[in-house]
Amino acid sequence: MENVKEDRTLDLSGLSCPLPVVMTSETMRKMEEGQVLKVISTDPGFERDIWSWAKQSGNILLKVEKEDGKTIAYIKKASEAHEPSLWYWIKFHSLGVKLHIRQFCIQINPFVKKPTHFITFSAISEGTRAEKELKKLGEKDAVLIPIPDEIDPRCGVVLAVHGEKKAREIYEKLKDMDIAVEAIYEKKGKEYERVYP
């Protein structure tokens, strides 16, 4: 599939997560079945995000190209496509704002032990589910925050924990609950190193 003829182009250069996926979803929702949207993005996590979004929405990702630091995606509207509503994206964006504020509060509060270990998830929904399940169990040693760019530049969340022993304990507990945990990273200076599994 060398040449793909797009019906519409959406240049989202300069916008960061989650806006490229939100605007792509809203544009696709208004397109007709079979039409092709060309999306241009400079967000470093856009390629992985758009693959995931296409799979979830039922649209067809025809091809992805890299050119001059930009990711260019060609997406075909499928008949069975089901893009999330604008209300869904508003709730998603407000979650991001809430998590960034939470992260900032942890950083500036001198009375809180700073997290040293970070548990990653296969999806944001798994992270929010993990937080809810841990709250039910009375677990207060893990805080859901945005994933550091050094671990993954895409939109995502991590559970921030102080201490590797506690992080492993929570990781195993979540795994036993069938929550899609991926790994534990340890912060070492400005770097993050995968330490488990």
UniProtKB/Swiss-Prot annotation:
The active site is at C17. It holds the Pfam family TusA. SUPFAM superfamilies: SirA-like. InterPro entries: Se/S_carrier-like, TusA-like, TusA-like_sf. Belongs to the sulfur carrier protein TusA family. PANTHER family: SULFUR CARRIER PROTEIN TUSA, SULFUR CARRIER PROTEIN YEDF-RELATED. This is Putative sulfur carrier protein aq_1421. It comes from Aquifex aeolicus (strain VF5).
